[in-house]
Design a protein with these regions (language model features):
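Serine-hydrolase catalytic machinery in alpha/beta-hydrolase-like enzymes
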Residues: 5-9, 13-18, 42-43, 51-150, ...
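Generic structural signal for well-ordered alpha-helices
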Residues: 139-146, 220, 224, 267
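N-terminal targeting or regulatory segments adjacent to alpha/beta-hydrolase or S9 domains
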Residues: 1-46
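Short beta-strand/loop motif that positions the catalytic acidic residue
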Residues: 201, 207-209
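Acidic catalytic loop of the alpha/beta-hydrolase fold
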Residues: 212-217
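Primarily recognizes the serine-hydrolase "nucleophile elbow" in alpha/beta-hydrolase
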Residues: 143-202
Length: 275
């Protein structure tokens, strides 16, 4: 079956939604701060966007929904999974997904809240909703999302993953669990995986840290040492003058200069390892 794309606004009602999803996820207007910080419109001629549903056996509900964005053209394209923070698929992450597609990647942003109604329209409620879910099943949903994207008809079979905060930690652990099925990962200020699991990583990693992020950075040296001892292909960057969340241009923690550098490095890294 060939995938068809229909450009739809972020969080718009669409025919791709499950019938039992709540009205909370049906808002078709961006929150003011998100509208002001959007960098790539869903109507941009360089991309095509749609929401997709796919199976997720063993996950929260057995089904998942994600925001799939393809570059213009027929493909196949290298694939990049974009994993949100701990508050669901908000407009910031949807914009990041469109940014990746503009660079030539088939990009998918799963919404971990989709089994219970989807992103509710504000980050505060989204955070409460995500906290209520089983973390093990959430991770299974991300594993299934990665496999869905890698095997998509428009994918070239090469898989990368990037994520932010909670999503950064997921990227690190996807590298452990997927092994050779994941080619590259770029976690932003995410929790490191267990040291004993590092040997399982086969993906190339670019690990991005904020300078002022004590909780996440507490494991950095241990993570670096384990990667070196296991002879993994990786690079780590720390961005001067930044705090946790510095890439998110919809919050006060945004650091425009360093976010630009980090994103350019991310795209270059994926182009190198996923082509």
């Amino acid at each position: 079956m060939q995938t068809s794309f229909l450009n739809v606004p972020a969080q718009a009602p669409s025919r791709f939604r499950c019938a039992n999803w709540s009205g909370l996820a049906m808002a078709n207007v961006l929150l003011p701060r998100y509208a002001e910080t959007q960098t790539i419109s869903f109507t941009d001629e360089r991309i095509k966007t749609r929401y997709v549903e796919y199976d997720s056996p063993g996950g929260t509900s057995g089904k998942m929904r994600g925001y799939l964005v393809k570059p213009a053209g027929d493909g196949p394209f290298p694939a990049v999974l974009v994993i949100h923070e701990n508050r669901g698929l908000n407009p910031y992450i949807e914009d990041v997904t469109r940014r990746a597609a503009v660079e030539g990647f088939l990009a998918l942003a799963p919404d971990e809240l989709s089994p219970i109604g989807g992103y509710p329209g504000n980050d505060g409620d989204g955070k409460v909703m995500q906290k209520s879910l089983d973390r093990g099943k959430l991770f299974t949903d991300m594993l299934n999302s990665a496999r869905f994207l890698k095997g998509h008809e428009l994918s070239n079979g090469k898989l990368g993953a990037t994520g932010f905060c909670y999503g950064g930690g997921v990227v690190n652990n996807l590298a452990v669990r997927l092994g050779a099925d994941m080619d590259a990962g770029v976690p932003f200020y995410g929790r490191a995986p267990a040291t004993g699991d590092i040997a399982k990583i086969q993906a190339s990693l670019m690990i991005q840290y904020a300078e002022n992020d004590p909780r996440v950075n507490a494991l950095r040296e241990e993570y670096q040492k384990a990667l070196e001892e296991n002879k993994k292909d990786f690079v780590m960057y720390t961005y001067e003058g930044t705090r946790h969340g510095f890439h998110n241009n919809s919050t006060p923690r945004y650091n425009e200069e360093q976010a630009k550098i980090a994103w350019e490095r991310t795209m270059s890294f994926f182009k190198k390892h996923l082509s």
